[in-house]
Curated annotation (Swiss-Prot):
Top-level taxon in the UniProt lineage: Viruses
Signal peptide boundaries: none
Pfam families, alphabetized: Late_protein_L1
Functional summary from the UniProt entry: Forms an icosahedral capsid with a T=7 symmetry and a 50 nm diameter. The capsid is composed of 72 pentamers linked to each other by disulfide bonds and associated with L2 proteins. Binds to heparan sulfate proteoglycans on cell surface of basal layer keratinocytes to provide initial virion attachment. This binding mediates a conformational change in the virus capsid that facilitates efficient infection. The virion enters the host cell via endocytosis. During virus trafficking, L1 protein dissociates from the viral DNA and the genomic DNA is released to the host nucleus.
Organism: Human papillomavirus 68
InterPro entries on file: Capsid_L1_Papillomavir, Capsid_L1_sf_Papillomavir, dsDNA_vir_gr_I_capsid
Region entry Disordered, spans: 126-145, 480-505
Location of this chain's protein in the cell: Virion; Host nucleus
Keyword Transmembrane helix: no
Record protein name field: Major capsid protein L1
Keywords: Capsid protein, Disulfide bond, Host nucleus, Host-virus interaction, Late protein, T=7 icosahedral capsid protein, Viral attachment to host cell, Viral penetration into host cytoplasm, Virion, Virus endocytosis by host, Virus entry into host cell
Length: 505
């Protein structure tokens, strides 16, 4: 007998519709006008390990300048709507606005390739856990030693119209702070912050807040022992809805472990007894298992350089295909292949002594960096239709404010008081409220500001990157000086031959 029964399958409803994010190519029209912009030579000099404060009558301190810092350039561009455009019919200011699109970039790096060392004169290392015949179970009060390392090798370039996002592990909060005892391991929390100029990169010890998570101040080299090391959050920037934080990125990382040590100090989490068989004599109590390697970036070579070569942006990884909103770019750069630290020596006497005495000389260390930025920008137009303006207002209302567009407030239904004698002492002060000052959204963040408002040129063939762009675009340059070939005038010549007369015999 056949029986009907309801299906056991669940009924799935379609997900609710979401607002669609469109690509900038859908509402931005690119023109055929290209401009070159470049900086002068950008130099910075400082101490590679820490900031030197003012002392000895010195009015200014020495900044911290390390190859293991991020260099974040905030590039300011001119307003294209106030730009002198040679073609007056290019756009209609009543119905259109102009924006810049970055189509080419070259990051020039000066100085020779080199390896710079970092270290700590009181580095926390107990035993050599790789080559020692046995590990000591004794825990001396102070086993720190003077150790230097060549850190992780990194080359990085991130370009976008907003700062790049970094991530690091910081000290979190406990759910039950009453149960936390002194000496317990703190909870960890993943924190996302903008990458600023001068922030430390991951040098091989991880991305974390060493100042709050390592209270010994001797677990890592001097340059990061009281700093926060950040790592770019590629996952979040790749998932950015509008794709403003990362048009594209270039990166190359290289690392291996040179030495293997363990840390001195009491082990916080003891090894469970069922994981080993108890020994005798010096092996009765296991030594510290808190292992830590010394990183090494190994050899640097010109064959693996990411800099001093042009890059062309045809299609960005996100929805923003190189459009520079707010007329600015953020360029995040890291290059540890030129990390040489200069050592300088000066004598404490008026003259250099004839016999060497180390007590009569002072040693200093400095690090220098050299940059040269070049860009190719394309002029673009945006037609201000209702849909486009509504979409831009949803994305970033400040863009419309920069274009002198604003939302009219609703009419007020309340009465407004209007006094007759405004200068009378019998009434309250009638001074107008001051206009609100436009606040910088990145106020308080540290960047290397680069102003290119007066460095744009349409003569691309006069600049190195411009000539490379014309070559890859297949545009032939017209000669401007020198003799020109004249067009030959057409002349008619007779090619007919006279026929010989036949003579009859």
């Amino acid at each position: 007998m056949a029986l009907w029964r309801a299906s056991d399958n669940m009924v799935y409803l379609p997900p609710p519709s979401v607002a669609k994010v469109v690509n900038t190519d859908d509402y931005v029209t690119r023109t055929g006008m290209y401009y070159y912009a470049g900086t002068s030579r950008l130099l910075t000099v400082g101490h590679p390990y820490f900031k030197v404060p003012m002392s000895g009558g010195r009015k200014q301190g020495i900044p911290k300048v390390s190859a293991y810092q991020y260099r974040v350039f905030r590039v300011t561009l001119p307003d294209p709507n106030k730009f002198s455009v040679p073609e007056s019919t290019l756009y209609n200011p009543d119905t259109q606005r102009m924006v810049w699109a970055c189509v080419g970039v070259e990051i020039g790096r000066g100085q020779p390739l080199g390896v710079g060392l970092s270290g700590h004169p009181l580095y926390n290392r107990l035993d050599d856990t790789e080559n020692s015949p046995f590990s000591s179970n004794k825990n001396p009060k102070d086993s720190r030693d003077n150790v230097a390392v060549d850190c992780k090798q990194t080359q990085l370039c991130i370009i976008g119209c907003v700062p790049a996002i970094g991530e690091h592990w910081a000290k979190g909060k406990s759910c039950k702070p009453t149960n936390v005892q002194q000496g317990d391991c703190p909870p960890l929390e993943l924190v996302n912050t903008p990458i600023e100029d001068g922030d430390m990169i991951d040098t091989g010890y991880g991305a974390m807040d060493f100042g709050t998570l390592q209270e010994t101040k001797s677990e890592v080299p001097l340059d990061i022992c009281q700093s926060v090391c950040k790592y770019p959050d590629y996952l979040q920037m790749s998932a950015d809805v509008y794709g403003d934080s990362m048009f594209f990125c270039l990166r190359r990382e290289q690392l291996f472990a040179r030495h293997f040590w363990n840390r001195g100090g009491m082990v916080g989490d003891t090894i469970p007894t069922d994981m080993y068989i108890k020994g005798t004599d010096i092996r009765e109590t296991p030594s510290s298992y808190v292992y830590a390697p010394s990183p090494s970036g190994s050899m640097v070579s010109s064959d693996s350089q990411l800099f001093n070569k042009p890059y062309w942006l045809h299609k960005a990884q996100g929805h923003n295909n190189g459009i520079c909103w707010h007329n600015q770019l953020f360029l995040t750069v890291v290059d540890t292949t030129r990390s040489t630290n200069f050592t300088l020596s000066t004598t404490t006497d008026s003259t250099v002594p004839a016999v060497y005495d180390s007590n009569k000389f002072k040693e200093y260390v400095r690090h220098v960096e050299e940059y040269d930025l070049q860009f190719i920008f394309q002029l673009c137009t945006i037609t201000l239709s209702t849909d486009v303006m509504s979409y831009i207002h949803t994305m970033n209302p400040a863009i419309l404010d920069d274009w002198n567009f604003g939302v009219a407030p609703p009419p007020s239904a309340s009465l407004v008081d209007t006094y007759r004698y405004l200068q009378s002492a019998a009434i309250t002060c009638q001074k107008d409220a001051p206009a609100p000052v436009k606040k910088d959204p990145y106020d308080g963040l540290n960047f290397w500001n680069v102003d290119l408002k007066e460095k744009f040129s349409s003569e691309l063939d006069q600049f190195p990157l411009g000539r490379k762009f014309l070559l890859q675009a297949g545009v032939r340059r017209r000669p401007t000086i020198g003799p020109r070939k004249r067009t030959a005038t057409a002349t008619t010549t007779s090619t007919s031959k006279h026929k010989r007369k036949r003579v009859s015999k």
